[in-house]
Amino acid sequence: MNQSLLTQFGDPFERVERALRSLRNGNGVLVTDDENRENEGDLIFPAQTLNEVQMAMLIRECSGIVCLCLTDEKVRSLGLPMMVENNSSRFKTAFTVTIEAAHGVTTGVSAADRVKTVKTAVAENAKPEDLNRPGHVFPLRACPGGVLERQGHTEATVDLMKLAGLQPYGVLCELTNIDGTMARLPEVVTFANKNNIPVVTIDDLIMYRKQHQKKVS
């Protein structure tokens, strides 16, 4: 990864801290992984404070496949089965069946409807019957160990929310270019600067978590 592009956002520790401040303020962050992995930047917002303007940005600027990152406990409490029994995808991305709010939506596709679905799913007292399946929101189950167990955007999202002191749920979507290709780090940085969004890498988060655990222990 071209670290020179990232230095404008601070050192790894500072990048994580900036990301956490943004999330606590109800704003988004951009999370990039390694060039040898997906080599993508995901735009991420806290599910807890998600609004229609932010959802519209996810739909407009990203791939349109808006995912809701959940803990394993939340997935089980909502009774969400995995999308497939045998996951043969390259990075074992843990999709569950897709969801829609059972009440308060129309077709489920609009930004408002997708926000409603997200809010319904992450509600503290949410029950399986509050959601219809299939739908237009794609839940992802994070590994319990977070980025220390799996170096994915799903785990990074849940880890960031926990570190920010928020509900451990977030929405993500992969940033794309205007021609539909995937945004790589140079395009991610350009988008971040244009929209005043902090950038953090999964490697930054791994380092931060390891240091944090040392302090705790």
Curated annotation (Swiss-Prot):
D-ribulose 5-phosphate binds at R37, E38, D42, R150, Q151, G152, H153, T154, E174. Binds 2 divalent metal cations per subunit. Magnesium or manganese. The keyword Lyase applies. Transmembrane segments: none annotated. SUPFAM superfamilies: YrdC/RibB (SSF55821). Mg(2+) 2 binds at E38, H153. The record marks H136, E174 as: Essential for catalytic activity. Keywords: Lyase, Magnesium, Manganese, Metal-binding, Riboflavin biosynthesis. Its EC number is 4.1.99.12. One of its GO terms (molecular function) is magnesium ion binding. One of its GO terms (biological process) is riboflavin biosynthetic process. Its cofactor is Mg(2+); Mn(2+). Mg(2+) 1 binds at E38. InterPro entries: DHBP_synth_RibB-like_a/b_dom, DHBP_synthase_RibB. Pathway: Cofactor biosynthesis; riboflavin biosynthesis; 2-hydroxy-3-oxobutyl phosphate from D-ribulose 5-phosphate: step 1/1. It catalyses: D-ribulose 5-phosphate = (2S)-2-hydroxy-3-oxobutyl phosphate + formate + H(+). It comes from the Bacteria. GO terms for cellular component: cytosol. NCBIfam families: ribB. Homodimer. Catalyzes the conversion of D-ribulose 5-phosphate to formate and 3,4-dihydroxy-2-butanone 4-phosphate. Belongs to the DHBP synthase family. This is 3,4-dihydroxy-2-butanone 4-phosphate synthase.
